Curated annotation (Swiss-Prot):
Function: Molecular chaperone. Has ATPase activity.
Region span, C: 564-635
Keywords for the protein's UniProt record, in alphabetical order: ATP-binding, Chaperone, Cytoplasm, Nucleotide-binding, Stress response
Name listed for the protein in its UniProt record: Chaperone protein HtpG
Organism listed in the record: Bordetella pertussis (strain Tohama I / ATCC BAA-589 / NCTC 13251)
SUPFAM superfamilies membership: ATPase domain of HSP90 chaperone/DNA topoisomerase II/histidine kinase, HSP90 C-terminal domain, Ribosomal protein S5 domain 2-like
Segments of this protein annotated with the region A: 1-346
GO molecular function: ATP binding; ATP hydrolysis activity; ATP-dependent protein folding chaperone; unfolded protein binding
Family: Belongs to the heat shock protein 90 family.
PANTHER family with a match to the protein in the record: HEAT SHOCK PROTEIN 90 FAMILY MEMBER (PTHR11528)
Subunit details: Homodimer.
UniProt-listed InterPro entries: HATPase_C_sf, Heat_shock_protein_90_CS, HSP90_C, Hsp90_fam, Hsp90_N, Ribosomal_Su5_D2-typ_SF
Length: 635
């Protein structure tokens, strides 16, 4: 937008190691979709103008008498360059070094650890990470950035330059107008981009929704030269109004998808979106998207969260996490409020009644979107659940007002089909309950395999009663808030004295009573031998194929949760389990006849194998092996 000259005091610096790695990966993984460079650079230019507009609310002098913000795209066939210019906030020297030479964001190490070498998969990850400015090097073998931050003098501009190979130079420069010019020196095989029609086509496809005017030199056909020739007049090539302010009927699905890619910097299309204008107690417009893939930093506490916040179409901040509850932190998009003050801060957002109304309304809108997807687009919902199901489970504790709605959206693995895929809803389970059954049964474990092979399931399989198999880390926390569904209690098959009386006939009840009396002496011997390790020993009806299992009280922390707490360095109470024995198992019969000299070893072996089957670590593995070998030699 303005001519620039540089002084000679240039300094050469090295890229951060992660930048070099990202540049190499990006050039090789994203080349098939190389046109995104223009989308990314125009998006950056738009952000720079938004930030200037926001800072100028308190410092109007930053506008320097030029309040018409715009983006300009030009090309020079002779020089083989494309230039993207803006008159936004600009960069100081320190900002240029920080923003153009390093990746200053959390989760960088996790991002690189997930790269596989598969171009398609890595392209998706790189897209999630956000390539931004570095996408320039997909099509350019040298990039020059000329920038002056608003408020600095003309001779305090900077010139940044790099070939993307590992180093960049930065030098003082003079620049009459504020803002940034990004000059791409194209690679030898990128001639097709030196074409006004091609650039306009890319801009209209990827950046039509940008609210600022994107201008290019008007071109007319020159019959003598046989080509389009640029004139001095500029024309706006995009619609230049905020997409979310338009009527839904005037927006195509493709425009919605491209807007998502701009606000999220995602490489892939969104899974679903909702666009609404809300009027009443609080007036705002929301355009919210559910991504198709979870970001690599979904579980990083310091990662970016939330949506873009605008007030009366003026950009206020990125990642306004207060506008959505934490369990919907994967949602991307824009919320434009008509009621919040323009000088709103993050502190005000935490206390504002209007923000609470927006958060509640937006949560309900996203849940409605998910409900519609679950009911009408089963494959899409299965994709959503695989990517974000564990996060949605957090909502059972965080959002009491919507707990029932969230519960209906949950999906689990189940003994119904024995598959690891989490496809069973509570409604599915209730619809298959046996006559007389009034509880929803579940088992928790460290892994799906451990849950599916839990000895606690044996009696349920025998009776044909379905059990939900829960192995996500969040499940135990979720269950502390979610106690029932549709009036039916959620009951762990590994807690308390299992009551299946409603499913047993009179003859079976009589037999159970007789067996308990018959095995009373053995129970007392085991109780005495294991007094230090267990709270109680009792005969069980929950086992069919296993000799014993351990359970805890109905209101005690499960062994699975205790292990999680200890692994996280948290204090965990010592809970003595109850040992339940299977009176019909041959090993129990063998122990019943054991001599006093051997009984202690048999009792300890029975407890240790029950603990191992439950997924616990036994206190003394060496003693367990020695004891087992000794008893095997005597067998």
């Amino acid at each position: 937008m303005s001519q620039t000259t540089t002084t000679s005091a240039s300094e050469t610096l090295g890229f951060q190691a992660e930048v070099k790695q990202l540049l190499h990966l990006m050039i090789h993984s994203l080349y098939s979709n190389k046109e995104i460079f223009l989308r990314e650079l125009v998006s950056n230019a738009s952000d720079a103008c938004d930030k200037l507009r926001f800072e100028a609310i308190d410092q109007p002098g930053l506008l320097e008498g030029d309040g018409e913000l715009a983006i300009r795209v030009g090309y020079d066939k002779a020089a083989r360059t494309i230039t993207i210019s803006d008159n936004g906030i600009g960069l100081s020297r320190d900002e240029a070094v920080a923003n153009l030479g390093t990746i200053a964001r959390s989760g960088t190490r996790e991002f690189f650890s997930q790269l596989t070498g598969d171009k398609q998969k890595d392209a998706q990850l790189i897209g999630q990470f956000g390539v931004g400015f570095y996408s320039s090097f997909i099509v350019a073998d040298k990039v020059t950035v000329l920038s002056r931050r608003a408020g600095l003098a003309a001779n305090e501009a900077i010139r940044w330059e790099s070939d993307g190979q590992g180093e960049f130079s930065i030098a003082p420069a003079e620049k009459a107008g504020r803002g940034t010019d990004v000059v791409l020196h194209l690679r030898a095989d990128e001639d097709e981009l030196l074409n006004g029609w091609k650039l306009r086509e890319i801009l209209r496809r990827y950046s039509d929704h940008i609210s600022l005017p994107i201008r290019m030199a008007k071109e007319d056909w020159d019959a003598e030269k046989g080509e389009q020739v640029k004139g001095d007049e500029l024309e706006t090539v995009n619609q230049a109004n905020a997409l979310w302010t338009r009527n839904k009927s005037d927006i195509t699905d493709e425009q919605y998808r491209e807007f998502y890619k701009t606000v999220s910097h995602d490489y892939d299309d969104p899974l679903a979106w909702t666009h609404n204008r809300v009027e009443g107690r609080s007036e705002y417009t929301q355009l919210l998207y559910v991504p198709k893939h979870a970001p690599f930093d979904l579980w990083d506490r310091d990662a970016r969260r939330g949506v873009k916040l605008y007030v009366k179409r003026v950009f206020i901040m990125d990642d306004a996490e207060q506008l959505l509850p934490s369990y919907l932190r994967f949602v991307r998009g824009v919320i434009d409020s008509a009621d919040l003050p323009l000088n709103v801060s993050r502190e005000i957002l935490q206390e504002s009644r209007d923000v609470r109304a927006i958060r509640e309304g937006s949560a309900k809108r996203v849940l409605s979107l998910l409900e519609d997807m679950a009911e009408n687009k089963a494959e899409d919902y299965a994709t959503f659940w695989t990517e974000f199901g564990q996060v949605l489970k957090e909502g059972t504790g965080e959002d009491a007002a919507n707990r029932e709605r969230i519960a209906r959206l949950l999906r689990f693995a189940s003994t119904h089909d024995g598959e690891q895929a989490q496809t069973v809803s509570f409604a599915d389970y209730v619809g298959r309950m046996k006559d007389g059954q009034d509880k929803i049964y579940y088992v928790t474990a460290d892994t799906f395999t451990a849950a599916a092979n839990s000895p606690h399931l044996e009696i349920f399989r025998k009776k044909g009663i379905e059990v939900l198999l829960l192995s996500d880390r969040v499940d135990e926390w979720m269950l502390s808030y979610l106690r029932e569904f549709d009036g039916k209690s959620l009951v762990s098959v590994a807690k308390g004295g299992l009551d299946l009386a409603e499913l047993a006939d009179e003859e079976e009840k009589k037999r159970q009573s007789e067996v308990a009396e018959t095995f009373k002496p053995l129970v007392e011997r085991l109780q005495q031998a294991l007094a230090e390790q267990v709270k109680e020993v009792r005969v069980t009806q929950r086992l069919v194929d296993s000799p014993a299992c351990v359970v805890v009280g109905q209101n005690e922390l499960s062994p699975h949760l205790l292990r999680m707490l200890k692994a996280a360095g948290q204090e965990a109470p010592e809970v003595k389990p109850v040992l339940e024995i299977n009176p019909d198992h041959a090993l129990v019969a063998r122990i019943r006849d054991a001599s006093d000299a051997e009984f202690g070893d048999w009792a300890a072996l029975l407890l240790d194998q029950a603990l191992l089957a439950e997924g616990a670590q036994i206190a003394d593995p060496a003693a367990f092996v020695k004891r087992l070998n000794g008893l095997l030699l005597k067998a």
